[in-house]
């Protein structure tokens, strides 16, 4: 198939304006500046998941804190009871370190100093 010179020029004359029209739309300028705050849907979802996990472990954290506080209160009360037992006017009172109680030497019963 032979393409004559006139057909080539006609085809070129048709394609050149089309190519220029397409290239001008591709290179369109804009005066708008887009600034992203970093607050994307993915970061919001990640934050929501972290908050949910924090809330789920809240009950466990509270239990641990209560247990620690309870053990500290128990040790503090035992320390105070030991001091009272040792300073008691009752000569038969003695402090039992294994049970953390003040006992009577004669009977072995718990006494209140």
Swiss-Prot record:
Residues 1-28 form the signal peptide. Keywords: Signal. It comes from the Bacteria. InterPro entries: DUF1283 (IPR009700). Pfam families: DUF1283 (PF06932). The keyword RNA-binding does not apply. Belongs to the UPF0482 family. This is UPF0482 protein YnfB. The gene is ynfB.
């Amino acid at each position: 198939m032979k393409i004559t010179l006139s057909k080539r020029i006609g085809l070129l004359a048709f394609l050149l304006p089309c190519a220029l029209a397409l290239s001008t739309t591709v290179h369109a300028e804009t005066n708008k500046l887009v600034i992203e705050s970093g607050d994307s849907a993915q970061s919001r979802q990640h934050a929501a998941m972290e908050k949910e996990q924090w809330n789920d472990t809240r009950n466990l954290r509270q239990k641990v804190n209560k247990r620690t506080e309870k053990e500290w209160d128990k040790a503090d009360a035992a320390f105070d009871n030991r001091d009272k037992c040792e300073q008691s006017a009752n000569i038969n009172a003695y402090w039992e370190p294994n049970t953390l109680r003040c006992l009577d030497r004669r009977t072995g019963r718990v006494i209140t100093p």
